[in-house]
Structures are given as structure tokens and as C-alpha cells.
Curated annotation (Swiss-Prot):
This is Large ribosomal subunit protein bL19. The keyword Plastid does not apply. HAMAP family: Ribosomal_bL19 (MF_00402). Belongs to the bacterial ribosomal protein bL19 family.
Length: 119
């Protein structure tokens, strides 16, 4: 591991939720307004994840008042408070850009069935 990789590894967040493309997530974002800070929730479907390491980012799409809104978040950014997984989605693509053209029920994503392992 060279020096740059070591410095990047130190700055990466350790407690990142293991979400994938197709999952519905709730992202808690720090908003700074003047000298005040607040946390704003942004909930939607993860339609893509890019890059890796400290440069990793993901795109979340939600429908707000009938209009599709997409927001790109750097995964290891200090403005991200938490990323919570609301539901797991079952998709067979790495990028879900086709959801941009779909409306209503056609834009739904199948929910992944979770079967706990019996011990």
C-alpha cells in the first residue's frame, strides 16, 4: 500500500451500510444554513454506484410532487450523516437509468425476499 492509498484509507468512513443498486435508502444529509446546522432526510431508490475507494459515489432517485429528482452523494463525504436501508430491491442491472422513462407502477422494483438462516 503506497502513501496515497494509506491516506485515503484513513479518511474513509468505516460504518457504511452495505446497500446495493435497487435498494430504497434514507440518506441523512447535514445542511448548513448560516451558522446553523440541521439534518435533512432524502429517501429514494439507488439507481447507480460509481468508482470505488474514497471517490465512491451513488445516485438516489425519488419522485417529489410528480417530478423525478436525482441526487448524487459522495459516499465518504462529511455531509452524509447516515445511510439507512429501508427495503432491499431485486434487480438484474448495475445501473437503473431506465427508471427515468417509467412512471407509476411500471417504475416499481421487486422486493428481495429475505430468508434468515436457521441455526
Amino acid at each position: 500500500m503506497n502513501t496515497i492509498d494509506f491516506l485515503e484509507f484513513e479518511q474513509m468512513k468505516k460504518n457504511v451500510a452495505p446497500f446495493k443498486v435497487g435498494d430504497t435508502v434514507k440518506v441523512q444529509v447535514k445542511i448548513v444554513e448560516g451558522d446553523k446546522q440541521r439534518i435533512q432526510a432524502y429517501q429514494g431508490v439507488v439507481i447507480s454506484r460509481q468508482n470505488g475507494g474514497i471517490r465512491e459515489s451513488f445516485t438516489v432517485r425519488k419522485i417529489s410532487n410528480g417530478i423525478g429528482v436525482e441526487r448524487i452523494f459522495p459516499l465518504h463525504s462529511p455531509i452524509l450523516e447516515t445511510v439507512e436501508i429501508v427495503t432491499r430491491g431485486h434487480v438484474r442491472r448495475a445501473k437503473l437509468y431506465y427508471l427515468r422513462k417509467l412512471r407509476g407502477k411500471a417504475a416499481r422494483i421487486r422486493e428481495k425476499k429475505y430468508v434468515p438462516i436457521a441455526k
